[in-house]
A protein has these predicted regions:
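Secreted/luminal cysteine- and crosslink-motif detector
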Residues: 5-8, 44
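Charge-rich, low-complexity N-terminal segments
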Residues: 17-159
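Short, Lys/Arg-enriched N-terminal segments with co-localized hydrophobic residues
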Residues: 7-20
Length: 159
C-alpha cells in the first residue's frame, strides 16, 4: 500500500475487478431527417441519416427459474422494446421544440408530413441519452446506449 496525503491507497491492477456482470447488446435502426438550429455549418440544413441504436444492458445474476432461466432477459423482449422506440422516430422529421415557427409546423402537418418534436437538440449525443433513459424507464439496467448517425460516427451515453 502507498501512503498519500495521510490515507492508504491500494494499487489498482488491470486484472482486478470488483464485480461480475453478464451483458446483452442489441440494436435497432431508423431513418429520419433533422437539422441543428443555430449551428454554423452543413448540419443547419435539413438532412437525413440511417441511424443505428445499440443498447447494452447488464445484470450481476441470471434468472433462476421459469422460461427465462439462465438469461438476463429474453432477447426478443429487449429487441422489441428498443424497436418500438426507434419505430416512433422512423421516416419523420425530428425537430427541437421551438426551432421552427408555428406556421411552418402547421404547413408540414397540412401536407401530412410526420414531424416529431423533441425537448433536445437532435444530435447523436442527445439521442444516445434519450435511448438510454427510455430503456431505463422500461425497467432495464442499461449500461450504455450508442447511436450511430453514419457507419463510422457514433456517440454513446452511460452513467
Amino acid at each position: 500500500m502507498n501512503l498519500c496525503c495521510g490515507c492508504f491507497v491500494r494499487p489498482l491492477f488491470l486484472y482486478e475487478r470488483s464485480f461480475n456482470m453478464y451483458t446483452l447488446k442489441t440494436n435497432a435502426s431508423f431513418d429520419s431527417a433533422h437539422f441543428l438550429a443555430g449551428y454554423e455549418g452543413k448540419c443547419s440544413n435539413i438532412h437525413g441519416h440511417h441511424w443505428t441504436v445499440e443498447i447494452e444492458v447488464g445484470s450481476n445474476s441470471l434468472e433462476m427459474g421459469g422460461n427465462n432461466r439462465g438469461m438476463i432477459v429474453d432477447f426478443s423482449r429487449l429487441k422489441t422494446d428498443l424497436k418500438n422506440i426507434a419505430d416512433a422516430l422512423d421516416h419523420c422529421l425530428i425537430v427541437e421544440i421551438g426551432s421552427l415557427k408555428r406556421r411552418t409546423l402547421d404547413v408540414l402537418e397540412e401536407e401530412h408530413f410526420k414531424v416529431v418534436e423533441v425537448m433536445f437538440r437532435p444530435t447523436a449525443e442527445n439521442f444516445a441519452k434519450f435511448f438510454y433513459e427510455e430503456m431505463k424507464q422500461k425497467g432495464y439496467h442499461v449500461l450504455k446506449a450508442t447511436v450511430y448517425e453514419t457507419p463510422n460516427n457514433c456517440a454513446a451515453y452511460m452513467e
